[in-house]
Curated annotation (Swiss-Prot):
Entry-linked PROSITE patterns: MFS (PS50850)
Protein location: Cell membrane
Topology of this chain in the membrane: Multi-pass membrane protein
GO MF terms, alphabetically ordered: antiporter activity
InterPro entries: ATG22/LtaA_families, MFS, MFS_dom, MFS_trans_sf
The UniProt record lists the keyword Membrane: yes
Pathway(s) per entry: Cell wall biogenesis; lipoteichoic acid biosynthesis
Protein name: Proton-coupled antiporter flippase LtaA
Any single Gene Ontology cellular-component annotation: plasma membrane
Residue intervals passing through the bilayer: 15-34, 46-73, 80-99, 105-126, 138-159, 165-184, 211-231, 243-264, 276-298, 304-326, 338-358, 370-390
Length: 396
């Protein structure tokens, strides 16, 4: 009994520390990717094309690394992989201090940061306890979202004081996360190493066994990300509001998401499979309706209400979807499988803005991007709704 209590305490301590490490690394990512490089063209000689390329390469590196990181963790162990990641992140961001306007350093740092964050995510996802998955995944996604947003806002404030003087803060945050890592005892599901050919075959096998999940993993991210390029224009040109009022809408959505992740996500635990199905299906349908509604709204107060509803639903849909995916994963392949899943999700987030921007540009109508995003959620609702109904009938 005492050994069990000590083990539970150790697991809880490790989970909390990993949450803090995830928060800090996402904090650094928010500072650099969402804030620092976006401001560079306005305060240095860096061209917008360079920062846009850095932004894209960051997420390409993230998605590509996710695809193989589970296998690398099993082959080399967590200490080597994570330490390498921290070294890459710290060194690359440290270079930004000395070369704040170097195109090579800006792109290189973005790529290295994308690689460095990948193993932390995979370890977090694979270490979640099954009987507490909804609750713990709520905490994981909350740490991710809070880190990104607070990092972005914090860096925005520092840039207003001086555009490049506080660049050292990014590498400092990574250094703190790196130090905290040495107080964590990370365990993998197994440590079996395989030849490269065997690992490649396993990637193909994992992919084939989870094809059912790929539309949801890929298209959810694409549907949301498609709106990113047009939302500022939608706010200022269609709703005719200031940047501050638009920011308030983002904050309201973020607060709704945070509240849902912290308090509503635990509803997923110890509930029936049909409850989980209901949350996922309701989320897809509600997203379709709310996003479609945005195309007809010109009142900022209604937009704020919709933003709150989207945030609240997002905060419970993510843990529910994660729990649904977890049921398909073999217990000894968690790192590899979550890595592949994250890679597919990252690819969806990359193609979403591309489609959203192109649709608006070629049709010259912002509403068409809203219709495109809503249509994706309709397709997901029909596809997975059919699966849930068929699966429910089989269970009977």
């Amino acid at each position: 009994m005492q050994d069990s209590s000590l083990n539970n305490y150790a697991n809880h301590k490790n989970f909390i520390l990993m949450l803090i490490i995830l928060f800090l690394m996402e904090f650094a990512r928010g500072m650099y990717i969402l804030s620092y490089i976006n401001f560079l063209p306005t305060v240095t000689s860096i061209a917008v094309a360079i920062t846009s390329l850095a932004f894209s390469i960051h997420f390409i590196a993230d998605a590509s690394t996710n695809f193989v990181i589970g296998f690398l963790l099993k082959k080399f162990g967590t200490k080597i992989v994570l330490t390498t990641g921290f070294i890459l992140a710290f060194t690359s961001l440290f270079l930004v201090i000395w070369f704040p306007a170097s195109p090579f350093v800006i792109i290189f740092s973005a790529m290295m940061l994308g690689i460095a964050v990948s193993p932390i995510w995979v370890i977090m996802l694979s270490s979640v306890e099954e009987d507490k998955r909804g609750k713990q995944m709520g905490y994981v996604y909350f740490s991710w979202l809070l880190g990104l947003l607070v990092g972005m806002v914090f860096m925005n404030l520092l840039i207003k004081v001086h555009p490049t003087r506080f660049a050292f803060m990014m590498s400092l945050v990574v250094l703190i996360a790196w130090i905290l890592y040495y107080f964590v005892d990370v365990k993998l599901t197994n440590y079996n190493t395989r030849p490269v050919k065997a690992q490649l075959r396993q990637i193909v096998d994992v992919t084939k066994r989870h094809l059912l999940l790929f539309p949801g993993i890929l298209l959810q991210g694409a549907a949301i990300a498609a709106l990113v390029p047009i939302l500022p224009t939608y706010a200022t040109k269609v709703i005719n509001v200031s940047t501050i009022e638009y920011t308030v809408a983002i904050i309201i959505g973020g607060i709704g998401c945070a509240v849902s992740m912290l308090f509503l996500s635990k509803l997923i635990d110890n509930r029936s499979r049909n409850f989980m199905y209901g949350v996922i299906l309701s989320g897809f349908i509600l997203y379709m309706i709310l996003i479609f509604t945005l195309s007809m709204i010109v009142n900022i107060h209604i937009v704020w209400i919709i933003a709150l509803a989207i945030g609240l639903m997002y905060g419970i849909l993510l843990p529910a979807w994660n729990t649904f995916m977890a049921r398909f994963i073999k217990s000894d392949e968690q790192e590899e499988t979550w890595g592949v899943f994250n890679s597919i999700q990252g690819f969806g987030s990359m193609i979403g803005p591309l489609f959203g921007g192109l649709i608006t540009q070629f049709t010259n109508n912002l509403n068409n991007t809203f219709y495109f995003s809503a249509l994706i959620f309709l397709v997901l609702a029909v596809f997975y709704g059919s699966y849930f109904i068929a699966n429910r009938e089989k269970a009977k």
